[in-house]
Amino acid sequence: MDIIIRPTRKSDYNQLLEVEIAATPGLSYLPNVFDKFLHDITGHFLTAEVGGKVVGCGKFSMMIDGSAWLETLRVLPEFQGIGVGKAFYDEFLRL
Protein backbone atom coordinates (compact mmCIF):
# COMPACT_ATOMS: atom_id res chain seq x y z
CA MET A 1 0.00 0.00 0.00
CA ASP A 2 1.63 3.21 -1.18
CA ILE A 3 1.34 6.27 1.04
CA ILE A 4 1.63 9.57 -0.80
CA ILE A 5 2.48 12.70 1.19
CA ARG A 6 1.83 15.91 -0.71
CA PRO A 7 1.12 19.59 -0.07
CA THR A 8 -2.43 20.23 1.11
CA ARG A 9 -4.76 21.92 -1.36
CA LYS A 10 -7.77 24.10 -0.60
CA SER A 11 -9.90 21.42 -2.29
CA ASP A 12 -8.86 18.95 0.47
CA TYR A 13 -10.84 20.86 3.10
CA ASN A 14 -14.00 18.73 3.26
CA GLN A 15 -12.11 15.45 3.20
CA LEU A 16 -9.77 16.64 5.94
CA LEU A 17 -12.73 17.70 8.07
CA GLU A 18 -13.97 14.11 7.79
CA VAL A 19 -10.51 12.89 8.84
CA GLU A 20 -10.53 15.17 11.87
CA ILE A 21 -14.04 14.12 12.94
CA ALA A 22 -13.09 10.44 12.72
CA ALA A 23 -9.60 10.77 14.23
CA THR A 24 -10.37 13.22 17.05
CA PRO A 25 -14.10 13.11 17.91
CA GLY A 26 -15.23 16.15 19.84
CA LEU A 27 -12.27 18.27 18.72
CA SER A 28 -12.88 20.91 16.07
CA TYR A 29 -9.52 22.50 15.33
CA LEU A 30 -9.09 22.41 11.56
CA PRO A 31 -11.92 24.83 10.63
CA ASN A 32 -10.18 27.54 12.65
CA VAL A 33 -6.70 27.05 11.19
CA PHE A 34 -7.07 25.56 7.70
CA ASP A 35 -6.54 28.78 5.71
CA LYS A 36 -3.77 29.92 8.06
CA PHE A 37 -1.98 26.58 7.62
CA LEU A 38 -2.31 26.79 3.82
CA HIS A 39 -0.59 30.18 3.72
CA ASP A 40 1.96 29.78 6.52
CA ILE A 41 5.40 30.28 5.01
CA THR A 42 7.18 29.06 8.17
CA GLY A 43 5.90 25.51 7.82
CA HIS A 44 4.46 22.75 5.70
CA PHE A 45 0.83 21.63 5.67
CA LEU A 46 0.72 18.18 4.11
CA THR A 47 -1.93 15.63 3.20
CA ALA A 48 -1.61 11.84 3.06
CA GLU A 49 -3.30 9.73 0.40
CA VAL A 50 -3.62 5.97 0.13
CA GLY A 51 -5.08 4.61 -3.08
CA GLY A 52 -6.25 8.09 -4.05
CA LYS A 53 -8.15 8.54 -0.77
CA VAL A 54 -7.27 11.39 1.62
CA VAL A 55 -6.43 9.64 4.90
CA GLY A 56 -4.61 12.26 6.98
CA CYS A 57 -2.93 15.62 7.38
CA GLY A 58 -0.05 17.10 9.28
CA LYS A 59 1.33 20.59 9.90
CA PHE A 60 5.02 21.07 10.67
CA SER A 61 6.68 24.41 11.40
CA MET A 62 10.24 25.54 11.97
CA MET A 63 10.72 27.74 15.00
CA ILE A 64 13.06 30.73 15.27
CA ASP A 65 15.45 28.79 17.52
CA GLY A 66 15.83 26.02 14.92
CA SER A 67 13.55 23.56 16.67
CA ALA A 68 10.50 22.11 14.97
CA TRP A 69 6.85 21.99 15.99
CA LEU A 70 4.40 19.37 14.83
CA GLU A 71 1.24 21.45 15.19
CA THR A 72 -1.20 18.77 14.12
CA LEU A 73 -1.28 15.19 12.88
CA ARG A 74 -4.54 13.45 12.00
CA VAL A 75 -4.99 10.01 10.43
CA LEU A 76 -8.25 8.15 9.76
CA PRO A 77 -8.56 5.38 12.37
CA GLU A 78 -8.79 2.64 9.73
CA PHE A 79 -5.43 3.80 8.31
CA GLN A 80 -3.62 4.08 11.65
CA GLY A 81 -0.86 1.57 12.25
CA ILE A 82 0.15 1.18 8.59
CA GLY A 83 2.88 3.84 8.53
CA VAL A 84 1.02 7.03 7.62
CA GLY A 85 2.34 8.90 10.67
CA LYS A 86 5.86 7.66 9.95
CA ALA A 87 5.52 8.82 6.34
CA PHE A 88 4.62 12.30 7.61
CA TYR A 89 7.62 12.35 9.96
CA ASP A 90 9.96 11.14 7.22
CA GLU A 91 8.73 13.89 4.89
CA PHE A 92 8.99 16.56 7.59
CA LEU A 93 12.58 15.50 8.29
CA ARG A 94 13.37 15.63 4.56
CA LEU A 95 12.01 19.16 4.32
Which residues does each PLM region occupy?
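Short amphipathic alpha-helix that is part of the acyltransferase structural core
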Residues: 1-32
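Conserved beta-strand in the GNAT
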Residues: 47, 53-61, 69-74
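Short loop/turn motifs at secondary-structure junctions and domain boundaries
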Residues: 36-41
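Conserved acetyl-CoA-binding loop-helix of GNAT-fold acetyltransferases
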Residues: 75-77, 81-95
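N-terminal "mature head" segments of proteins
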Residues: 2, 45-47
